[in-house]
From Swiss-Prot:
It comes from Arabidopsis thaliana. One of its GO terms (biological process) is cell-cell signaling involved in cell fate commitment. Glycans are attached at P86. One of its GO terms (cellular component) is apoplast. It comes from the Eukaryota. Belongs to the CLV3/ESR signal peptide family. Keywords: Developmental protein, Differentiation, Glycoprotein, Hydroxylation, Secreted, Signal. Residues 1-35 form the signal peptide. InterPro entries: CLE27/CLE43 (IPR040274). The modification Hydroxyproline is found at P83, P86. This is CLAVATA3/ESR (CLE)-related protein 27.
Length: 91
């Protein structure tokens, strides 16, 4: 009987420690929120300029020619040339 009582006592102690530690972790996560640090420019950009800057940032404006530049050239010049024979290097 004493062995079962010791086992139950250690299980209860372990369970209480797990509950206590999880509660402390919960409190730490809830109360340790840090706000974002925002750095604003001294002179805010206008709406149109800001949109253009975002387009340049995410889509790399200026790297590709505009769509209108392909209009008068036909389809064949805008496509890659297909080789007439297999490439010996990659076969």
């Amino acid at each position: 009987m004493t062995h079962a009582r010791e086992w139950r006592s250690s299980l209860t102690t372990t369970l209480l420690m797990v509950i206590l530690l999880s509660y402390m972790l919960h409190l730490f996560c809830v109360y340790s929120r840090v706000g974002a640090i925002r750095i604003f420019p001294e002179t805010p950009a206008s709406g149109k300029r800001q949109e253009e800057d975002l387009m340049k940032k995410y889509f790399g404006a200026g790297k590709f020619p505009p769509v209108d530049s392909f209009v008068g050239k036909g389809i064949s010049e805008s496509k890659r040339i297909v080789p007439s024979c297999p490439d010996p290097l990659h076969n």
